[in-house]
């Protein structure tokens, strides 16, 4: 099954992450801390914590930082108490945007998110206003040139729900979020290492932006991504090259 071009977006996302690795670490420390607080410090019984630690390892985060974050989460060390908040809104031409945050100050966070929307031509929506346009899924992106038939066999055997070959040759594997850790381990055991592996809010349909609208939309997304309390930004907008 064919899909949109993903590879350029994946490379852009990885380059952006490399450029602000310190910020990525801060976000991952929050995620590890909250995952440990909610589900305990044992990765075998806490798949969310396992995923967060895997992301930390992939981002070259020192093991000491990871362990301290776990200890803070389970109460072994003092630290800020973070809560998870989701905001929803609209960008240029009504594009749907979800903003997932972790914060120790809800008032500050909502003001900053609202300001970013307002400044860049978007607007905040109410809870549930756009979330229904997205599916909660595990996603793996494999580089162009990955053996499609072998990957499909391994993915479906591992419990994946769908395997999508994109226009640019990259391959996308989707699975239920609760099966993410199992599918990831099975794929890696079969010799397939994803360029990007995460649990996301995936848009059911996408809207492509080009020209000035693409530039405006990218500025809004960047403004939201750059807020300290923001963990993830999801959108149904595809920014054309």
Swiss-Prot record:
GO biological process, one term: regulation of DNA-templated transcription
Subcellular location: Cytoplasm
Superkingdom in the source lineage: Bacteria
Predominant localisation class: cytoplasm
InterPro entries (alphabetical): Integrase-like_N, TACO1_YebC-like_2nd/3rd_dom, TACO1_YebC_N, Transcrip_reg_TACO1-like, Transcrip_reg_TACO1-like_dom3, YebC-like
Coiled-coil parts of chain: none
Key words, A-Z: Cytoplasm, DNA-binding, Transcription, Transcription regulation
Intrachain disulfide bonds: none
Gene Ontology terms, MF aspect: DNA binding
Any single GO CC term annotated in Swiss-Prot or TrEMBL for this entry: cytosol
Family: Belongs to the TACO1 family.
Protein's name according to its UniProt entry: Probable transcriptional regulatory protein RSc2190
Species of origin: Ralstonia nicotianae (strain ATCC BAA-1114 / GMI1000)
């Amino acid at each position: 099954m064919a899909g949109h071009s993903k590879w350029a977006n994946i490379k852009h996302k990885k380059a952006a992450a490399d450029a602000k690795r310190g910020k990525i670490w801060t976000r991952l420390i929050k995620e590890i801390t909250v995952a440990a607080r909610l589900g305990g410090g044992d990765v075998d019984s806490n798949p969310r914590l396992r995923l967060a630690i895997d992301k930390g390892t992939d981002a070259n985060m020192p093991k000491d930082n990871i362990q301290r974050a776990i200890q803070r989460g389970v109460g072994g060390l003092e630290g800020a108490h973070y809560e998870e908040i989701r905001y929803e809104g609209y960008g240029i031409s009504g594009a749907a945007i979800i903003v997932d945050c972790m914060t120790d100050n809800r008032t500050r966070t909502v003001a900053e998110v609202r300001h970013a929307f307002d400044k860049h031509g978007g607007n905040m929506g109410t809870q549930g206003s756009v979330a229904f346009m997205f599916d909660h899924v595990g996603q793996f992106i494999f580089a162009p040139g990955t053996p499609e038939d072998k990957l499909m066999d391994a993915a479906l055997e591992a419990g994946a729900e769908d395997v999508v070959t994109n226009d640019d040759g990259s391959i996308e594997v989707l699975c239920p979020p609760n099966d993410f850790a199992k599918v990831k381990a099975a794929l890696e055991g079969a010799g397939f290492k994803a360029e990007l592996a995460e649990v996301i809010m995936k848009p059911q349909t996408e809207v492509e932006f080009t020209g000035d609208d693409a530039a405006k939309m990218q500025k809004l997304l960047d403004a939201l991504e750059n807020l300290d309390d923001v963990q993830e930004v999801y959108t149904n907008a595809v920014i054309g090259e």
